[in-house]
Amino acid sequence: MIVCIAEKPSVAKDIARIIGATTARDGYMEGNGYQVTWTFGHLCELKEPDDYTPMWKHWSLAALPMIPQRFGIKLINDEGIKKQFATIEKLMQAADSIINCGDAGQEGELIQRWVMQKAQAKCPVKRLWISSMTDEAIKQGFQELKDQGEYQSLYLAGLSRAIGDWILGMNATRLYTLKYGQNKQVLSIGRVQTPTLALIVNRQKEIDNFVSEPYWVLATIYRDTQFTATSGKFTSKEEGEKAFSTIAGKPFTVTDVSKKKGNEAPPHLYDLTSLQVDCNKKFAYSADITLKLIQSLYEKKYTTYPRVDTQFLTDDIYPKCPQILNGVSQAKIMSQQKYLPLIQQLATISKKLPKSKKVFDNSKVTDHHAIIPTGVPPTGLTDMEANVYDLIAKRFISVFYPDCKFSTTTVLGEVINEDGPKPEKIEFKVSGKEILEPGWRVVYAKDVKNADDDDASDNANGNADSGNGAKKEVVEERTLPSFTKGESGDHQPTLTEKWTTPPKYYTEATLLRAMETAGKFVEDEELRAALKENGIGRPSSRAGIIETLFKRHYIRRQRKNLMATPTGIELIDTIHEELLKSCELTGIWEKKLRDIEHKTYDPADFINGLKEQINKIVIDVLSDNSNRRVTIMTEEDLKKKPAAKKPAARKASAKKMPAKKKDEATAQNVDTQNAAAQPVSAPQAPADPMVGKPCPLCGKGVIIKGKTAYGCSNWKSGCQYRQPFSQML
């Protein structure tokens, strides 16, 4: 008998139907020589400290660091899990061979390997490796089963990650809780969660300590077109006024007119992070909600495997693309067959689909390709699922359209004052961008913003006035009047006072990008791709990391902004060990885990390195003779509304402002403080407006209210919708 083990019952039932195992048994399906069983995600976990020795049961500084001689696994203590494992164990011990049908990724490999180890399976094991759950993909996967040994390095990377997280998390959490905690509250420390928290805290401090400074911009209007001085901003009013007086009353002369044609390629296909970023920007979906939505679309066979970190396809997908587009053309989203005209128009542009290296590149794909539609026309989608599918479908269609062709016109001018002993000249510039052929942009013509507009306008490091570094110039799409070199005439100069502004608070979108690039803020897609190697966390785990920070009350959401709580700020201030809070160092560890997966780094070296680091951290913390304590915030604390007070840094900036600006700044400070002090959830009304609404995730159940979060009445059937009260601002 061949035993197949899937990661969840719904996947097992699909596989069983395809291979003919149609007889339902207790905990598995049977038929046609197969027995198809399943896990519920993780059935096993690494042992707890007290499973190794009773000395580690009670938290004690003297027992640190805790490092087992050999790490072991155990069943999760749950009656349902124990019952299902007993079924799996019985099937595996009698099996002639096993097919690992787990999720095709690092975590999926680890989940199934641990179950097989715990069940003491001795027979040969094959691996089903597929990128979508369509019937065709499952059938092809069973025809092309791999030897499990081909994925040994993937398993070792997952195992090293789990052990590394145990060593750092277990030891550092006990260490910091015992040394700096109070009131028996746990201070949770994690290899990825703590550097992520540090990003949010450091950004918040930059904002709190920011002192707004005035500057002046010189511009002039010539022929109803505003030109800006190329010399940049003036940091003193006197300098600006001097420049203004230099050009006042003097003629403006056009010195150069240049036109340059350019092409704008379609945006890359989606990986998980870029999809989460766009869903947060466009729909305000959290990273966790987006992951659940795309997972649901995958399990319904409408999109391909979601937990990916590549934006490319392999060459073998190209012949399937016409069929996929045909399926997408039949899709009805919100009762509209919106993709059919776009795909029909694509057929008029070229008889054969173009094949670009920017889309198809085997060297950029390891386990799975970018997220694309499967070609199965979706039905019965919730509004939230439809929004996510719409992004993926449009992105897939757009990559087969031609580049957008545009023309950029740059006009240079100058004003010369010859009244003094030495002529003074001030130069000006204006640029305009004209779309010649929209190309792929027609796919997004009805959208409020084009696909890449958000990336161009949203700089994670602040805005153009922040003074934090140069930004890539964004040329406004406008058609300039026809100018001729040498023409001259009157103009109207202006000197405008502006104020530098602080960096922006993180949103989930900008935080995900920062995690992806280990805290380095880049706009260029190619550079961003290179930095992914040193990103912190995996695409599939980043949403969970952010949710953990919410659950620990280290951060909270204020509209779309992520704000650190006093507990989160104090915890980061208390941690002096860079390994625990440095994105760069954590990113290096993350790269080593990828190297293990690629067979270029020894897992033993990774574990030994972490052991050395935790030893050093324990010694350093125990040597701290201060009496520092971290304030622990509870749910009730977050609901309290303390009196608003202005940060010192804001006062400093207000002092430099004129009366009107000062009033605005004061009002802004009060609003910010009041907003930060708002309760996490509003006082309960007699009838909660959320309760009873259709579930936005599965569409089958209705929203119910629990102790700490809203959920779905269909949770017993597997719906994972959960919206904590602390995120309902």
Where are the language model's segments positioned?
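Phosphate-interacting basic helix/loop segments used at nucleotide- and nucleic-acid interfaces
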Residues: 71-98, 199-200, 278-279, 391-397, ...
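Metal- or metallocofactor-binding catalytic centers and their adjacent structured scaffolds
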Residues: 237-270, 276
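Conserved short loop/turn motifs at secondary-structure junctions
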Residues: 1, 99-104, 183-186, 259-268, ...
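Basic, low-complexity terminal or inter-domain segments flanking catalytic cores
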Residues: 2-3, 118, 287-288, 309-729
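Active-site phosphate-binding and catalytic loops of NTP-dependent enzymes
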Residues: 23-28, 148-153, 174-178, 205-210, ...
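Intrinsically disordered, low-complexity regulatory segments
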Residues: 1-166, 170, 448-449, 471
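C-terminal or mid-to-C-terminal helical accessory/interaction module adjacent to the motor/catalytic core
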Residues: 80, 93, 135-216, 220-222, ...
